[in-house]
């Protein structure tokens, strides 16, 4: 059924919940996992930040992304699965575009990612990478919502 499962990871608790669900799917289907972290350099790439200052910030973002991927891979290995990892950089400002692109290049048949469930003005101001992936993807997308404060951990 799902043989190639792309998991978008960002280091958040919601992302970890998404990874846990992806592991369950992979175990039940015999699927393989690709962990993807997107470094969005547009966050700080402006005309107001001189290169001398931005270069160390970009490097810190890359290092943080590599750590996030390594931690996620450790979770996968503890579940007796293997995975591939990919750190992707974008200047487009659209993380969703990169996630969908990576899914296409790897020929994923499922994308799994966490969603923070923003509503109202926060959603309008910040947008939603998860919603954009859902709109752009030609393969099924499994969105895992953040755990509400009153909900017990599974």
What is each of the regions a protein language model found here?
Residues 74-111, 151-154:
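Structural beta-alpha unit
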Residues 38-67, 150-154:
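Acidic, proline/glycine-rich short linear motifs
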Residues 129, 137-138:
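Short, structured coil segments at secondary-structure junctions
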Residues 3-52, 75, 79-86:
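Small/aliphatic-rich secondary-structure junction motif
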Residues 141-151:
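Short, flexible loop segments at boundaries between secondary-structure elements
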Residues 110-132, 150-153:
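Glycine-rich, Arg-bearing micro-motifs that act as flexible, cationic patches
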Residues 51-54, 102-104, 129-130:
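Short, hinge-like loop/turn segments at secondary-structure boundaries
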